[in-house]
Each structure stands twice: as C-alpha cells, then as structure tokens.
Swiss-Prot record:
Its cofactor is [2Fe-2S] cluster; [3Fe-4S] cluster; [4Fe-4S] cluster. GO terms for molecular function: 2 iron, 2 sulfur cluster binding; 3 iron, 4 sulfur cluster binding; 4 iron, 4 sulfur cluster binding; electron transfer activity; succinate dehydrogenase (quinone) activity; succinate dehydrogenase activity; zinc ion binding. Belongs to the succinate dehydrogenase/fumarate reductase iron-sulfur protein family. The gene is SDH2-1. [4Fe-4S] cluster binds at C194, C197, C200, C261. Pathway: Carbohydrate metabolism; tricarboxylic acid cycle; fumarate from succinate (eukaryal route): step 1/1. This is Succinate dehydrogenase [ubiquinone] iron-sulfur subunit 1, mitochondrial.
Amino acid sequence: MASGLIGRLVGTKPSKLATAARLIPARWTSTGAEAETKASSGGGRGSNLKTFQIYRWNPDNPGKPELQNYQIDLKDCGPMVLDALIKIKNEMDPSLTFRRSCREGICGSCAMNIDGCNGLACLTKIQDEASETTITPLPHMFVIKDLVVDMTNFYNQYKSIEPWLKRKTPASVPAKEILQSKKDRAKLDGMYECILCACCSTSCPSYWWNPESYLGPAALLHANRWISDSRDEYTKERLEAIDDEFKLYRCHTILNCARACPKGLNPGKQITHIKQLQR
C-alpha cells in the first residue's frame, strides 16, 4: 500500500511485532548500563573517531530502554547516518535493529530521529564537527525493537482517506485512461511526492496528543491530493468525511511537518487548503 512497507525489517521477526510494541517515552536519558563498543580501528593513528548513541530496547528482554554507545572511524565509513548504522550492524553488533531499503530517499523506510530532528538516515549526513550523534526512533510511536516503530496506526489513517481515484461516471471504454490538462496536473505538485515515511506526523505536537483521532499531516496531505485531482468525482464526499474537529481541525499550523519533511513538502499548506474549502 505504501512505499515504506517495502523496507525490510532488519534483525527481528514480523510475527513478534504486535506483541512487542512499546511506546517510546517523550523524555528519557541514558543509564549507567549503557555499553560502549569500539571499532577494531578505534584509537588508530590518523583515525577520525565518532560516537553514535543509539536507542536500544529488546522485547525479548523487556526493561527500561537505554542508549548504547558505538564508536566508529569515519574514515572507514560512508558519509550518511545509514552508512554508520549498517557498519555497526555488519561489523560490531548484529543485534541492532532498524528498517532500511532503497538508500536513496525513495522508500521512506529508514525514518528516525537523529540529534533531535526527524529525517531519513539515508539522506542525513554524519556531522563531522559533533563528537556524538544520538539516534532514536520516531517520537511518540510504539517501539517494536530498537529503532523500529509500529506503523499500523499511521497506515490505517492513510487508508481511511481512501487514497485512490473514485469515479461516479462509468468509463465509456473499459480501462481507458482518464486525461487531465497540464494545469490540473500541476495542482498535484507538492503532494504526490510524499513517501509516507511519517517524519511529518511524528514531529507534530497535535499528533502526539491525539494519535487516534487526528489524522495527522501525512494523511491530510494525501486527502488534499485527491480532493485536488480533477479526475476524481468524490470531492464533496471527501471533504465531508474529514470535516471533524479532531480529524482535521487539530492542526494548528505549527509547521513542524514542513520542517521535518525529507522531500521538502509542506503538509501544513495542504491542510490549510482543505480548511478553506470547508467554509
């Protein structure tokens, strides 16, 4: 259904997802139990060592989550945060669990919080000037294991807006393409590019406090994408379906969503457009 679904789950079994889910605390600190693991090249002459503090929680041994330190030589690592995670998993700690797939900012699988900002690990460069980088799961989501969060509610909200073309007029010729002008096609720019990574929704305070009732920036952006599509004939019904004080109007245009989007989209702008159509 969504591009993020193709991201493979590294190091855990899908059958344990539902039972292993746990909510990541809004605020927490590492404990004295955190371990420090050094690369074999650590301390070597001419090395450029950097510490990565990574959120760890294992459903098979439940307890308080902690930050675990890993030190790697940046001279022996790719430039992106995902490169560091893959290096840690392949060479230092195979138990580290995270999602990833395309490595090109297309699938949205590797969304996580890096130094306090949501983003894609494959598009986030390692900051050379900082001695440490802290990596945690997307905030206010149920954690399955380590950096893997449960996306079930997020995808259900996306599904609820019926993200597909709906027609009332039967096609004159079966399977015939429904055309639209270049001008109408251009109206979809800034919406169709969404990769459903959830960086925007999990950066939104309104979504944090109303995750079951507020649809969130991503789902509402897609709602406007179909509301704005000249080929769709259910505009009125789509607007009525989300005309709700919680589904739509929990958005207070804080615009954390726009700042977090790795594709440079502005969900807040699209939500404002929906509100204007509701008047």
